[in-house]
A protein has these predicted regions:
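Acidic, metal/ion-coordinating pockets
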Residues: 1-196
Length: 198
């Protein structure tokens, strides 16, 4: 599970540590804190999950060279490398990829195409993006799947899920043992905000 996002510290460092402890107790691997990468064995293959964001105390997406070198190192020792990133500008008008550095309210949010392709070139087998709160394009780049944004999935009260911001695709991907994209299925879902009155 990726903890690399701008809401991971909504409840301070104590909340973030509590989340990490809860995930660990449940046997769920996590990545995202600076220097925190998940590794596991799946069906006899060593898999690494490296999560990046543009926020402090995270593995920094904006340091393209360090991210590239880290992915390359993990690709040397793991069969499959999955990269997750939280980047790109936000909003219902951000569905199209700008192929350039993005900024949101003055905060640099990265060039998601450059970052993603650089990670594949360094050895990543699957790259999954999130952050813009809307779905974005996916591409098969060098036989590796890049999904630039899967939109909103489990959103709490206060975040709009109206219209395009409520679309939340679930992506199921099959890779071969070398990390090549074999096939995938998109399960379409729509979030509906419901309030529970206590």
């Amino acid at each position: 599970m990726s903890l690399a996002n701008n809401h991971a510290r909504d409840f301070g460092e104590a909340g973030r540590l509590a989340t990490m402890n809860t995930l660990r107790e449940a046997g769920i691997h996590h990545s995202g804190l600076e220097g925190d990468f998940a590794t596991m064995e799946v069906n006899g293959l060593m898999v690494a999950v490296l999560a990046y964001a543009v926020t402090r105390n995270s593995n920094m997406m904006l340091d393209y060279d360090l991210a590239r070198d880290t992915v390359s190192d993990y690709a040397d020792t793991h069969n499959i490398v999955i990269v997750s990133f939280h980047g790109g500008a936000e909003g219902r008008d951000r569905t199209r990829l700008p192929f350039a550095e993005e900024v949101y309210y003055g905060e640099p949010r990265g060039d998601v195409v450059r970052f993603s392709r650089m990670m594949v070139d360094a050895g990543a087998d699957l790259v999954i993006g999130h952050g813009p709160h809307v779905i974005r394009a996916a591409e098969n780049y060098r036989d590796r799947l890049i999904a630039y944004s899967l939109g909103n999935f489990a959103t709490y009260y206060g975040i709009s899920v109206e219209g395009i911001k409520g679309i939340a695709p679930i992506l199921v991907v099959t890779l071969d043992s070398e990390g090549h994209f074999v096939n995938g299925t998109v399960h379409s879902t729509i979030q509906i905000l419901s309030l529970i009155h206590i």
